[in-house]
Amino acid sequence: MARAFRLAAMLIGGVTALGLFGFAVAWLVADHWNGVTAQPAAAEPSLPDVGWPVYAGDPGGSHFSGAWQVNRDNVTRLAPAWVFRTGEIGEGYTSVYKHTFQATPILVRTTLYFSTAFNRVFAIDAETGAERWRFDAGIDPEPHYTEVSNRGVVYWVDPDARAGQPCKERVFVGTLDARLIALDAASGERCTEFAGNGEVALKAALREADRGRAYPVTSPPVVIGDTVVLGSGMIDNWKAHLGLGTVWAYDARTGELRWKWHAIPRDPSADNAADWLPEQAARTGTANVWSPLSVDTNRGLVFAATGSASPDYYGGERLGNNRHANSLVALEAETGEIVWSQQIVHHDLWDYDLPAQPTLADIERDGVRVPVVILPTKMGMLFTFHRDTGEPFFAIEERPVPASDVSGEQAWPTQPFPVAPPPLVPHRAMTENDAWGLTPIDRDECRKLIASLRSEGIYTPPSLQGTIMIPGNGGGSNWGGIGWDQQRQVAIANTLHFPFVVALIPRDDFETVRDSGLYPDTEFSPQLGTPFGLRRKPLISSWEMPCVKPPWGTLAAVDMVRGKILWQVPLGTTRDLSGLPFGLNYGTPGLGGPLITAGGLVFIGAVMDDYLRAFDIDTGEELWRGRLPAGGQATPMTYQLGGRQYVVIAAGGHGSLGTSRGDYVVAFALGD
């Protein structure tokens, strides 16, 4: 995935360069980041404070704020209010090329708390950006971490502690090296009563055989009552027997393990044991929860979206539907017991793990407010379930999908499709007629390439000849998730539209093919313990041009009452991919999510040009864009404080995506 995104950066840059020769320029952009903050508009003393207490704004993941000072009439007056720099751009770390800055800060009274990729935690003044304290988790710089990112922290108040007592208010952060750390929110010092030294080692709760090489915690923990819950990332496609994907729950005061849950049934008494062959369940790994969790405090539920069983592209060592992998699971917060589970992908062969935070919403139907959970997916489909029972809100059909032609593989014959809303990305089979290019030469090359590959639409299994994955394993949707406007009953989703080519390689040929030089800029993975290795890259020509027409990234609004797409527009230009002072409005790949405000606006960065944008939520019209000092591959947040509304985003770039690097947190507010 990492190399594929870097390649996507190069190829879209090439599109921009060649776009000089006859392709329409969307707009000219001469602005550059200069670091100068604007003269602020006068504060409005009567403006109430509006907070952002947790990642995504609320425990249910709505990415919505009731702040309204900035609205459709005045958004063009937004300008930088303050800039904070962390000093971290990954230098000195072996995994610097994977460095990202994906954090979304949280607001507690007048302090913003956030984390960096290498697990430095900062507390800064929310009105000025002045630093209050910092903490360094001391991450070892030498290992090759599977992903270098951290999307945030969580805050908790101990109601039993006396006022002013150290660690009455705590900030929790998960780390790249599989630790959960508790910090005093006032000082940034470790809470030593938490597990004795202020941290717990997640792997200590697992058997040695289930620990795997890495357990990076990339999403923020959640708190429900006095329980801290978190999942973890995992290395992909290295081998079949990887670490066991686990959700952990700890006592927020003491660090004592309260429960742990995993999707793959090591225990024969597990509710899904009958769906697995015992010997395969014993050696299959992952099905981890690396995406953000959601919490329903009133119901005492934690919602977890699980990933793929290992490895991603060959399932002959894990026959069956692999129940609870690739599933939305509702867990009892007190016990970790399953309340309900809905599998979204059966027997995943495409790395279609569930990457996004489940979003809790109430949808009006026939005058009745129905509590639901909405799940965006890499397949570009939105699945919606009743929060109490897991019953589909929109009906789900099991539709036949293509069979595998690979020896030993048994692809599941059907896959779930919601009848509404329609998919936000194409699912159809690709033919030679779909080939796209900037010239007849590369278009003809793409035509021949498509004709040589297997393509029968979404869920076409991997093959030895090569299969077109549509959409690719980056999505559809990814970890940025969706935004939810409760009043409008509208979901906002940004999606990628970029097919990939996946080919299996017989084990005896893997090293020869990998080292042949015939497949430049291709990701190779061994999938040890199976008969096949893997190669994967975007569907492009040898000119590094896309073989599919734009847009390659979009932003959409979906009416969740009727299950209809209201609007869908390209998101992102090629402005920062070629060194030229303009960009083509083709839409680009992106990572990050939307922010919705009561001012009728959708804010989003995410894509491969260095801008934060504001859209009209009702029409999809772009109303404003603000230049960033580096790539904005993070989800913005907002708050009203001291009579002003601030819109804040981390701008540090994304090493794998290829955007410009930095260490900035930028706050925008209305200027004069």
Give the location of each predicted region.
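Repeat-blade elements of multi-bladed beta-propeller folds
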Residues: 52-56, 97-118, 145-179, 213-239, ...
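Extracytoplasmic/lumenal domain signature
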Residues: 76-89, 121-143, 157-162, 180-212, ...
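N-terminal Sec-pathway targeting helices
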Residues: 1-17
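Asp/Glu-centered strand-loop micro-motifs enriched in Gly/Pro and often flanked by an aromatic residue
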Residues: 66-75, 80-113, 138, 465-474
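Acidic, proline/glycine-rich low-complexity intrinsically disordered segments
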Residues: 50-52, 60, 86-88, 108, ...
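N-terminal pre-domain segments of enzymes
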Residues: 23-70, 413-440, 447, 519
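Short, solvent-exposed loop/turn elements at domain surfaces
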Residues: 59-66, 88-93, 122, 312-313, ...
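Segments forming glycine/polar-rich beta-alpha architectures that bind adenosine-containing cofactors
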Residues: 461-499, 504-506
